[in-house]
Design a protein with these regions (language model features):
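Amphipathic alpha-helical scaffolding segments comprising HEAT/armadillo-like alpha-solenoid repeats
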Residues: 2-17, 40-54, 76-89, 110-122
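Short inter-helical turns and helix N-cap capping residues of alpha-solenoid HEAT/ARM repeat scaffolds
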Residues: 56-57, 93-94, 124-125
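Short, mixed-charge aromatic SLiMs
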Residues: 88-95, 128-129
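Structural detector for internal amphipathic alpha-helices that build alpha-solenoid repeat scaffolds
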Residues: 2-7, 20-41, 59-76, 96-110, ...
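Short, Lys/Arg-rich amphipathic alpha-helical interaction segments
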Residues: 115-139
Length: 139
């Protein structure tokens, strides 16, 4: 195949949905460092944290917590970008999703993150409410 001068090969584009799935798969496999690097390169991924926490695979959700342990050390000024996404999933119907979001908020630990956790003190699920009480008591 002949390519004329000036003609450029267009890179294959990946949809956000596909990229979110790849992130979840990498987190499940324990490749958190790769995802840390992605977050460092593009801050829009913080908007996807809530979606990642809805994944049924426990290893993915655990990976999100580990991800934020890294990010709080390497990019402390950026972690609050996840707050809107995390606040959104606090209204999720599934208690474990709300609990996971609260756990990530506690890792972030900023005054704004803790204020969001405070709003969940009366969660209808007793386990979620207990997690909130434990976090606030440790503050």
């Amino acid at each position: 195949m002949e390519i004329s001068i000036g003609q450029q090969k267009k890179a294959a584009e990946v949809s956000d949905e596909e990229l979110l799935k790849v992130m979840a798969d990498f987190l499940e496999m324990g490749h958190v460092e790769n995802i840390v690097e992605m977050f460092k390169q593009d801050c829009r991924y913080y908007q996807w944290v809530g979606q990642l926490l809805t994944d049924e695979r426990f290893a993915v959700r655990l990976g999100v917590s580990v991800l934020f342990e890294y990010l709080i050390e390497e990019r402390p000024g950026d972690v609050e970008l996840a707050l809107p996404s995390l606040a959104d999933v606090l209204e999720h119907e599934t208690p474990w999703v709300r609990g996971e979001a609260i756990s990530v908020l506690s890792i972030i630990g900023t005054p704004q993150a803790m204020a969001i956790i405070q709003t969940m003190r009366k969660d209808p699920d007793p386990q979620v409410a207990a997690v909130v009480q434990d976090i606030l008591a440790a503050e």
